[in-house]
Amino acid sequence: MNISIIQSMINAIDKPAIFITPDYVIHAVNQPYRDTYQDDVITGQSRCHQISHRNTVPCDQAGESCPLAECQQSGRATTVVHNHKTQHGDSYCDILMKPVHDEDGMVLGYLEILERIQYASSQAGKG
């Protein structure tokens, strides 16, 4: 697996994005992702759940659905909404997770792209 090519592709994404392997290890990360979280990402060591949730276990072992596990089971892209621990406190994120295959169809890892969810006020304006 050529991480430098994957890193270049991750860098081309404007939204926070990472490339992770089936063991949850982050192997490529873009600057918007680094800017989102307080903890430093150490490629080849940091795990996605450690950075985004500050958990020692994957999401599905901590009460949330795990998009990586869902991708592994279905073999297809998936989206989930998570509450992440960001630089600015808790923030809801829409997560797109897509499997990345080699030319033989084998899964190399997973592309995760985040979109912060902005909520409108539930109260009608007065005035």
Labelled PLM ranges:
Residues 83-88, 101:
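PAS-family sensory domains
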Residues 34-53:
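PAS and related sensory helical modules
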Residues 100-127:
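Sensory coupling linkers of modular signal transduction proteins
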Residues 1-34:
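Sensory modules in modular signal-transduction proteins
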Residues 51-83:
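Terminal output helix/cap of sensory domains in signal transduction proteins
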Residues 81, 92-95, 111:
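PAS/PAC sensory module
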